[in-house]
Amino acid sequence: MIKETDLENIPDLLIKFNEPLSNYTYTKVGGPADILAFPATIEALTELSAKAKATDTPVTVLGNASNLIVRDGGIRGVVILLEKLDSVKVAGYTIEAQAGAKLKEVTQVAQANSLTGFEFACGIPGSIGGAVFMNAGAYGGEIYQVLVSCKVMDAAGNVSVLSASEMQFGYRHSVIRDKNLIVLSAKFELQAGDPTQIQNEMDRLNFLRESKQPLEYPSCGSVFKRPVGHFAGQLIQEAKLQGQRIGGVEVSKKHAGFMVNVADGNATDYEKLIALVIEKVKENSGVTLEPEVRIIGEK
């Protein structure tokens, strides 16, 4: 296991020990990380990864911790948050953003540069790295539609660039997930557009989001993938599960596809409620819901 002394001389690296991950997740749940690291440069990330590998220390990389549940026992080893790697560069019709850049900010950069095609992501509460990891999408748009290439690092510290076809995108899936790669940055190809029209479309999508989703409570976003031929929220409604509560977590009364932390809930509450919803929806409709949210850590 990596020691504190192994990390002291890595420049541009902020370290916290036994840090509650509930301070960083959108659900406001999650036990402690043994070591929580915030690299501010690719070099710091590379050196940290190399030292973790040399000491057989497990590494977990989190995006913006939005579509994520960290269990109450926390995460052993090193947890890396990439929020300090957040640069965004524009060249012509191309935007290149580091993994820690927030989707909302990248869409604002696109609008300011009269670039259209990224509006669908304006309200997704995630980072570029997390969005690429799971091929995030909303309102008919998905990351795969605009991504050109992605710079990644493997567990050995090797950096490579994957083309869009090499990313093997699927519904809420990419090769990043399969091969345990770290997204460093992503390049997107957009089109020329009118900045006023782009802003109007973003305003429209944000209004839809705010009117239909329970943004006033901590949540992990959409809990379940969309089953073929159905909508998860509708199936949950039909099973009369809206308002169903376990501990401090309940199925949102505003949008059945969300589970909200209404009263200091924990990850165990989330997992129990997810299991209950899967069971009851299966009984009612015959459809087996599959979680979209990523659940990690120790119980």
Curated annotation (Swiss-Prot):
Which SUPFAM superfamilies would you find in this protein's record? FAD-binding/transporter-associated domain-like, Uridine diphospho-N-Acetylenolpyruvylglucosamine reductase, MurB, C-terminal domain
For the FAD-binding PCMH-type domain, which residue ranges apply? 28-193
Reaction catalysed by this enzyme: UDP-N-acetyl-alpha-D-muramate + NADP(+) = UDP-N-acetyl-3-O-(1-carboxyvinyl)-alpha-D-glucosamine + NADPH + H(+)
- Catalytic-site annotation from UniProt: R172, S222, E292
Could you tell me what this protein is called?
A: UDP-N-acetylenolpyruvoylglucosamine reductase
Q: Where is the protein situated, by its record's location annotation?
A: Cytoplasm
Listed GO CC annotations: cytosol
Task: Provide the function of this protein.
Answer: Cell wall formation.
Taxonomy of origin reads: Bacteria, Bacillati, Bacillota, Bacilli, Lactobacillales
The record's HAMAP family line, in alphabetical order, gives: MurB
Instruction: Write down the EC number.
Output: 1.3.1.98
PANTHER family, sorted: UDP-N-ACETYLENOLPYRUVOYLGLUCOSAMINE REDUCTASE
Q: Give the organism, scientific name.
A: Lactococcus lactis subsp. cremoris (strain SK11)
Q: Which co-factors does it depend on?
A: FAD
